[in-house]
């Protein structure tokens, strides 16, 4: 995944930030969102 500068506590929090970044499938890893490119 691609780390983005968004803090998180759970993967559901990353869905929208990843969409906003033009990506999908957000996951929370080490307190930060990681996204999968389209």
Curated annotation (Swiss-Prot):
Record text about domains: Has the structural arrangement of an alpha-helix connected to antiparallel beta-sheets by disulfide bonds (CS-alpha/beta).
Tissue: Expressed by the venom gland.
Name of the featured protein: Potassium channel toxin alpha-KTx 3.8
Pfam families documented for this protein: Toxin_2
Keywords noted in UniProt: Disulfide bond, Ion channel impairing toxin, Neurotoxin, Potassium channel impairing toxin, Secreted, Toxin
Family: Belongs to the short scorpion toxin superfamily. Potassium channel inhibitor family. Alpha-KTx 03 subfamily.
InterPro entries according to UniProt: Scorpion_toxin-like_sf (IPR036574), Scorpion_toxinS_K_inh (IPR001947)
CC annotations in GO: extracellular region
Cited function: Potassium channel inhibitor.
Domain of life: Eukaryota
Location(s), subcellular: Secreted
